[in-house]
């Protein structure tokens, strides 16, 4: 069940305030945080369901029961894990007292995994765990709509995931 389905059910039950409070508790404990949708209109940002981002991938792997080899063999699971690791790296930076903010972006079927805004700089980040197709319609649509300072492909044919994680996030904002 995706977070928007869960939110819809809880809205029917009148528990959105409770859900928001639980998300705050999980974020305060350093476990999970909600990423808001990136938009030019701040009011519309608050009206969308957050994308849940784990802050430590051990939360995912501990409950999976998969060995490292099994996890890598399951392309879908590995893709979620790699995206979550990159997201955790970004979210931990954005939540560390910096002025940086982390979002996701989606418009119809087009999406960008992460949008990092630091001051006047905006970095669009797409994560791929395997070989990525050369076309990234979400990145192209985002670039057309928002003119980011930088667009970054992590994994696939872009920056290797291990290299991305080795550098502080400021490296990717300023270089």
Give each language-model segment a name.
Residues 122-131:
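Active-site ExK catalytic segment of metal-dependent nucleases
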Residues 149-155:
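Short, hydrophobic beta-strand segments that form beta-sheet elements in well-ordered domains
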């Amino acid at each position: 069940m995706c977070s928007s389905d869960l939110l819809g059910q809880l809205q029917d039950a009148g528990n959105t305030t409770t859900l928001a409070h639980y998300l705050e508790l999980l974020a305060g404990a350093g476990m999970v945080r909600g990423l808001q949708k990136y938009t030019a209109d701040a009011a519309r940002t608050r009206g969308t369901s957050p994308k849940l981002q784990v802050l430590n991938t051990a939360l995912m792997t501990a409950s999976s029961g998969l060995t490292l080899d099994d996890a890598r063999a399951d392309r879908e699971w590995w893709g979620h894990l790699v995206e979550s690791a990159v997201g955790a790296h970004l979210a931990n930076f954005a939540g560390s007292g910096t002025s940086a903010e982390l979002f996701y972006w989606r418009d119809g079927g087009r999406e960008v995994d992460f949008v990092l805004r630091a001051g006047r700089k905006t970095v669009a980040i797409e994560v791929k765990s395997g070989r990525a197709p050369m076309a990234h319609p979400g990145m192209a649509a985002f670039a057309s709509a928002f003119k980011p300072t930088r667009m970054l492909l992590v994994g696939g044919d872009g920056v290797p995931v291990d290299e991305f994680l080795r550098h502080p996030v400021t490296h990717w904002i300023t270089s």
